[in-house]
């Protein structure tokens, strides 16, 4: 979003995870959370650097083609590290969604309200601010 370098988002997510008290594995997971989805990184590489717990969380955070949202969220809810990172990821995405087009913003708000409201402190406030900005446009 916004043409920023790829690394900007994972670093921002890692900072949020750190602020929320995430341990080293959670912070590594934050940095790696989009690798399987957005790059050519291999699971073996992630495991070699982060270990099996980080790999498991990254797998849970990776949206596969044709994924079922309820199953995806169920997996995340069952893994404390994945849940922490997903909350931070969504929070950062909401913070940067102010820069996107209105149709995308509306869809993102609706999806957040349905699936993500309990994942992170501050999400409800950001959703309200986004909704208000949509109404003003």
Q: Language-model segments: which ranges?
A:
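Active-site helical microenvironments for divalent-metal-assisted chemistry
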Residues: 1-137
């Amino acid at each position: 979003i916004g043409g920023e370098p790829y690394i900007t988002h994972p670093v921002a997510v890692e900072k949020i995870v750190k602020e929320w008290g995430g341990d080293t594995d959670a912070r590594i997971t934050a940095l790696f959370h989009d690798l399987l989805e957005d790059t050519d990184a291999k699971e073996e590489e992630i495991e070699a650097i982060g270990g099996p717990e980080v790999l498991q969380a990254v797998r849970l955070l990776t949206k596969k083609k044709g994924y079922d949202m309820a199953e995806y969220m169920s997996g995340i809810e069952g893994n404390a590290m994945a849940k922490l990172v997903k909350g931070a990821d969504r929070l950062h995405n909401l913070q940067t969604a102010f820069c996107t087009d209105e149709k995308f913003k509306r869809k993102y708000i609706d999806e957040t309200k349905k699936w993500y409201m309990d994942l992170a402190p501050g999400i409800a406030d950001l959703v309200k601010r986004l909704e208000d900005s949509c109404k003003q446009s």
